[in-house]
Amino acid sequence: SKRLSNGCFGLKLDRIGAMSGLGCWRLINESK
């Protein structure tokens, strides 16, 4: 879960939610 926050431009998923999640999913897929 820590990687999610770091890969989201330093934003917290709890605050943005879907908006940040959309941009984070791409970073997570590339990381794996």
From Swiss-Prot:
Disulfide-linked positions: C8-C24
Tissue expr: Expressed by the venom gland.
Gene Ontology molecular function, alphabetical: hormone activity; toxin activity
GO biological process, any: blood vessel diameter maintenance
A Pfam family reported for this protein in Swiss-Prot or TrEMBL: ANP
Protein function: Snake venom natriuretic peptide that exhibits hypotensive and vasodepressor activity in rats.
UniProt protein name: Natriuretic peptide Coa_NP1
